[in-house]
């Protein structure tokens, strides 16, 4: 194989390589033996057409496209490796020549990884808003939330107030004409919950069971049903019941109802404090990591980040997200239908942070290289075992799905993140 690379501009160039006859000839034989099985030619049994007759009738060139398609991926990877390139986007391939009996010449327009000039990445001083401290108010709020979950709705005499639940019938109309989806019976609506369009719930406050209320609202301009968006509507609403939330007393019995592992309210408070401390410590560490990585990227210089890298990161993130949805039994089509969005919407959503993620990845990889981080066999095995446990898969199955090189890369990157984060101090 002959390989050459010509740089055209920063992080871009043309890779030229050949595919030799030593690879072409056996692949020609394989492709011919495959296609001849389907050829019907008078005078020859199906699948027994001589090669010479095929070449005379169709020309050997008829096989070339299948041959180059089969050989190109491995040949391209070998050429990239021989040229010592780190390609970061899909290449633009051009078959320059496929002459009979000659080596074939291929060119690939490639985008290469940009140079990263590291600045300070150790012993960084960072500021974070997160704190590890847990206050009494936070513990009380957690207990109050659990207490509210045990609340019961009881019939209330008198007018409804914010926070009450009303049981209603309603019929909606626009200019006196009822519309689809505008009718409901015995519907439980929490006042202040925001379940209905803006202004609806507020107009029921102050009214009691047995009353009929004419609720006048305007559908938002961005309402999901385009035929209703921006239009004024009247909902004739009958209130059947008004219910108020009745919360249990704040005592030891409540504590036991909330958590069967405790006997007293003080024990519940102590348990909740530990849980909050653990979660806040994780949040604090995440905040420090994020701030340290951001500062390390800010201190580095990335020489002309290719736009293609950002696009690749967007596609990677989307595929990872949709793959996660698929594991939960939600197909991409189902997700877009449920959310009322499109793949283009998802692309815009991820595009906003793609440049930041791409720069962070480049800097972290550069740190791993500068520090000489590598993965040991023991670390690789542990990573596979951890992934198997996370996704409830067999270790052997995970091992078969992941390439050793990818695992080595991920482990080295984790070490780089650790050295950036662990040496950082909070101002």
Curated annotation (Swiss-Prot):
Cellular component, GO annotation = cytoplasm
User: Which compartments does it reside in?
Assistant: Cytoplasm
Q: GO annotations under biological process?
A: 'de novo' cotranslational protein folding; cell division; chaperone-mediated protein folding; protein transport; protein unfolding
Q: What is its main location?
A: cytoplasm
Q: Which organism is it from?
A: Streptococcus suis (strain 98HAH33)
User: Gene3D superfamilies recorded for this chain?
Assistant: 3.10.50.40, Trigger factor ribosome-binding domain, Trigger factor, C-terminal domain
How are the domains described in the entry? Answer: Consists of 3 domains; the N-terminus binds the ribosome, the middle domain has PPIase activity, while the C-terminus has intrinsic chaperone activity on its own.
- Entry annotated with the keyword Cytoplasm: yes
What GO molecular function terms would the record report?
Answer: peptidyl-prolyl cis-trans isomerase activity; protein folding chaperone; ribosome binding
**What are the alphabetically sorted keywords of the record?**
Cell cycle, Cell division, Chaperone, Cytoplasm, Isomerase, Rotamase
The protein's name is Trigger factor
Q: Which domain of life is it from?
A: Bacteria
Group of enzyme by EC: isomerase
- Its biological purpose: Involved in protein export. Acts as a chaperone by maintaining the newly synthesized protein in an open conformation. Functions as a peptidyl-prolyl cis-trans isomerase.
Q: By its UniProt entry, which HAMAP family does this protein fall under?
A: Trigger_factor_Tig
């Amino acid at each position: 194989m002959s390989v050459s690379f010509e740089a055209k501009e920063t992080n871009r160039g043309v890779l030229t390589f050949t595919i030799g006859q030593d690879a072409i000839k056996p692949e020609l034989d394989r492709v011919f033996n495959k296609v001849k099985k389907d050829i019907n030619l008078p005078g020859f049994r199906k699948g027994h057409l001589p090669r010479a007759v095929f070449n005379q009738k169709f020309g050997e060139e008829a096989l070339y496209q299948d041959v180059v398609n089969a050989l190109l991926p491995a040949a391209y990877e070998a050429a990239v490796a021989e040229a010592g390139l780190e390609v970061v986007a899909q290449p633009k391939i051009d078959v320059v020549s496929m002459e009979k009996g000659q080596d074939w010449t291929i060119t690939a327009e490639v985008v290469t990884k940009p140079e990263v000039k590291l600045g300070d990445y150790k012993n960084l001083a960072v500021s974070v808003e997160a704190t590890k401290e847990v206050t009494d108010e936070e513990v009380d709020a957690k207990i109050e939330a659990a207490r509210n979950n045990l609340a019961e709705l009881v019939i209330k005499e008198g007018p409804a107030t914010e926070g009450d639940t009303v049981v209603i019938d309603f019929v909606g109309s626009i200019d006196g004409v009822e519309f689809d989806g505008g009718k409901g019976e015995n519907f439980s609506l929490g006042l202040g919950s925001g379940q209905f369009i803006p202004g609806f719930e507020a107009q029921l406050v102050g009214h009691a069971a047995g009353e009929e209320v004419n609720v006048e609202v305007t559908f938002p301009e961005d309402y999901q049903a385009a035929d209703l968006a921006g239009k004024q509507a009247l909902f004739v609403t009958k209130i059947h019941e008004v219910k108020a939330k009745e919360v249990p007393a704040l005592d030891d019995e409540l504590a036991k109802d909330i958590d069967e592992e405790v006997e007293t309210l003080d024990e519940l408070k102590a348990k909740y404090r530990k849980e909050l401390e653990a979660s806040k410590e994780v949040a604090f560490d995440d905040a420090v990591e994020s701030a340290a990585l951001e500062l390390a990227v800010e201190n580095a210089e990335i020489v002309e980040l290719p736009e293609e890298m950002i696009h690749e990161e967007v596609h990677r993130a989307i595929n990872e997200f949709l793959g996660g949805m698929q594991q939960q039994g939600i197909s991409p089509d189902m997700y877009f239908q449920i959310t009322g969005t499109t793949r283009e919407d998802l692309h815009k959503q991820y595009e906003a942070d793609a440049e930041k993620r791409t720069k962070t990845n480049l800097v972290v990889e550069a740190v791993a290289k500068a520090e000489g981080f590598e993965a040991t066999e023991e670390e690789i095995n542990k990573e596979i075992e951890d992934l198997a446990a996370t996704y409830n898969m067999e270790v052997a199955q995970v091992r078969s799905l992941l390439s050793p090189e990818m695992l080595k890369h991920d482990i080295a990157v984790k070490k780089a993140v650790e050295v950036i984060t662990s040496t950082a101090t909070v101002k």
